[in-house]
């Protein structure tokens, strides 16, 4: 009996020591489990939103067939004949010194929605004695590629890096227009401080003083009223937005 009681006592003492040991180890075990949980990546959530698609102006954006371009692009002068058009890239009077490929006529095209908005800008300006002159609208992809080639030939990669020439332009979508204001009485362009296609900070919309600053703001305000957005590094450049834009390479004829 005494031996049995002694064994029970030893057994209880062992259990107590074992329990005490486990309790002392519990904080360490819990800490280890917490570290492991933090280090383990969460399981994929099938209901989570998909990653955001890349911007529309990427090389992955396919070029739409010419037949599609014909249905979506509109000649701005067919909607408002009083808008003046002087496509610089159809002539040698541009920074490359030669006409760009794809410019076969002095006609400015835009996506119809943008062309209609531009026509409204012209109509709003005329009571003020002002009108629009367009230097560029829709631009074939091949012309944009020719601009990039030119920067390589003349060793001016900075023009791409600094945002003055784009390798994939909203002009290719028919959703950008380069333009200025004219005085309807004289037919002359208003002073904007720099010529079109000036590749320097002087062409940044906010970098002007006196009459040039006033004229830049006149143009900007008139365009913004109809939904256009100015590119702040080029006082002449405005873009428009439509759902599901497409790139085009249809020649301008």
Language model: regions and residue ranges:
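Positively charged n-region of N-terminal signal peptides that target proteins for export
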Residues: 23-26
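Short, positively charged and aromatic/hydrophobic N-terminal segments
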Residues: 19-20
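Compositionally biased, low-complexity flexible segments
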Residues: 2, 6-7
């Amino acid at each position: 009996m005494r031996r049995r009681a002694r064994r029970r006592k030893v057994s209880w003492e062992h259990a107590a020591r074992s329990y005490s040991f486990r309790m002392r180890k519990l904080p360490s075990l819990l800490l280890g489990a917490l570290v492991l949980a933090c280090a383990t990546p969460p399981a994929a959530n099938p209901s989570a939103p998909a990653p955001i698609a890349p911007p529309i102006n990427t090389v992955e954006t396919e070029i739409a067939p010419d037949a599609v371009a014909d249905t979506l692009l509109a000649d701005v002068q067919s909607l408002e004949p009083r808008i003046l058009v002087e496509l610089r890239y159809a002539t040698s009077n541009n920074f490359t010194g030669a006409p760009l490929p794809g410019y076969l006529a002095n006609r400015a095209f835009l996506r119809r929605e943008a062309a209609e908005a531009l026509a409204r800008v012209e109509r709003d300006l005329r009571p003020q004695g002002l009108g629009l002159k367009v230097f560029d609208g829709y631009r074939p992809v091949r012309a944009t590629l020719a601009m990039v080639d030119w920067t390589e030939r003349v060793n001016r990669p900075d023009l791409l890096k600094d945002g003055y020439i784009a390798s994939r332009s909203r002009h290719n979508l028919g959703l950008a227009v380069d333009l200025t204001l004219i005085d309807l009485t004289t037919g002359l362009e208003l002073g904007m401080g720099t010529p079109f296609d000036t590749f320097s900070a002087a062409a940044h919309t906010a970098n002007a003083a006196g009459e040039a600053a006033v004229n830049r703001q006149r143009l900007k305000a008139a365009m913004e009223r109809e939904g256009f957005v100015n590119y702040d590094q080029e006082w002449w450049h405005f873009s428009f937005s439509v759902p599901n834009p497409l790139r085009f390479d249809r020649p301008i004829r």
